[in-house]
Amino acid sequence: MLPLSSRSPKTEVRESKIHGRGLFAKADIAKDDVVAVKGGHIVDRETLRREITPTLGPVEIQIDYDLFITPVTDEERELSMLYSNHSCDPNLGIRGEITFVAMRDIRASEELTHDWAMTDDDDY
């Protein structure tokens, strides 16, 4: 099965001081470069809460008021994860609904983070 999401070849997943695994720059990334594109299935809030979150956990990003993009099986889960941890001072932003871009120049070895309040409907 092909990955549902795409991460830049300038990135790698490794252990994070923030939480579990994280996404890191393995080469310098220029401001506005595309770092990742989230993929998956589009589902409504009810389907997400009833069928997906209980078994897969929080794996979605919100793309509209009542629409989310998410994996729907355990096999797809790993293939859709971006591993971008949360930060209130992130170095990634979102262009459109699913494209993650560098908000500033990022040096090799920096952890790549985004503000999770921008991708889900939880209260932070």
Residue ranges and their predicted role:
Residues 1-124:
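Conserved catalytic SET/PR domain of SAM-dependent protein methyltransferases, capturing the structural core
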